[in-house]
UniProtKB/Swiss-Prot annotation:
A biological process from GO: fatty acid biosynthetic process
Native organism taxonomy: Bacteria, Pseudomonadati, Pseudomonadota, Alphaproteobacteria, Hyphomonadales
Record-annotated membrane-spanning stretches: none
Gene Ontology MF terms in the entry: phosphate:acyl-[acyl carrier protein] acyltransferase activity
Subunit and partners: Homodimer. Probably interacts with PlsY.
Protein name: Phosphate acyltransferase
PANTHER family: FATTY ACID/PHOSPHOLIPID SYNTHESIS PROTEIN PLSX, PHOSPHATE ACYLTRANSFERASE
NCBIfam families: plsX
Broad EC category: transferase
Enzyme Commission number(s) from the entry: 2.3.1.274
Keyword Ion transport in record: no
Keyword 4Fe-4S: no
Amino acid sequence: MQRKLTLSIDAMGGDAAPGVTIDGTAEFLAGRPEAHVLLYGDEARLAPLVAAKPGLAGRVTIVHAAEKITSDMKPSQALRRGKGSSMWAAVEAVKEGQADACVSAGNTGALMAISMLVLRKMEGVHRPAMTALWPTLRGRTVVLDVGANVDADAEQLVTFAIMGEAFARATLGIERPSVGILNIGSEEMKGHDEVREAHELLRNSPLKMDYRGFVEGDDISGGAVDVVVTDGFTGNVALKTGEGVARMLAGRMREAFTASLTSKMGAALAMSGLKRLKDFMDPSNVNGGVLIGLGGVSVKSHGGADARGFARACELAADLALSDYRTEIAANLARVGSGGLAAE
């Protein structure tokens, strides 16, 4: 028997909300018969959109929230003025036990700030981290932090490794995920003090982690490890660079295959392979960043995601809510506590 699941959704967040949000919710619910959704937002706008989709009857509950967090609102402003917003209400539902996880495609900084204030940090977590799933030659790799913290000391990097390992197990289905620290080289003497100290801490820790040492930038897309650990500044630059390269390649391929009649014929012959490549590179298939290390599940969908992309973010939230990844994180943080992080 499947466990019942409830998601709280900020229906007003995102570039094309609430239309895309409702469409994505419908797609998510079509594949999750055990799920129910709480939709937070302007009831007058949401009700007709929900009514137009018969599949949502009895599967969603609209909860009116008069305010909306705008895309240009600073995190500090969101904390001061956002309590009546759809985003705040969706996060609050997780805290109050009304929902198992929340999803928003709204303002990233605001969602992070509200989630940290409302859900609080897990015991032993000094700084939560933002995760991303990265397409690789081997499938998918978890990268964290990708923007929650501009810097991180050695012990925080170790915490990121612990959280990333549990996250990979829950989302990728890997029994013993491999973990590496992003560095400018694989040699032990490379990098700044923080990454070298974190390397020693992980290598000598009591954890049964499959720690592989340092990895380089090209190892991310190569799939050298299942979890890549870094600070938020480096991780965000890497993520945005990867997204830019993917868009550039897609554009160049489109130009190449439409440049002449011969190239168009070649594209027609290679259509099935090109479709597989397009699907692999489509960011909608890996949509959803998670602020990990909190007392509840908060998932950030890309603001420009289409319905399929938003549905993927909801699926990620559901998978995490049904997993015991936070219990694993707490247990491993306890194991390395009380002096267990002292490097030899």
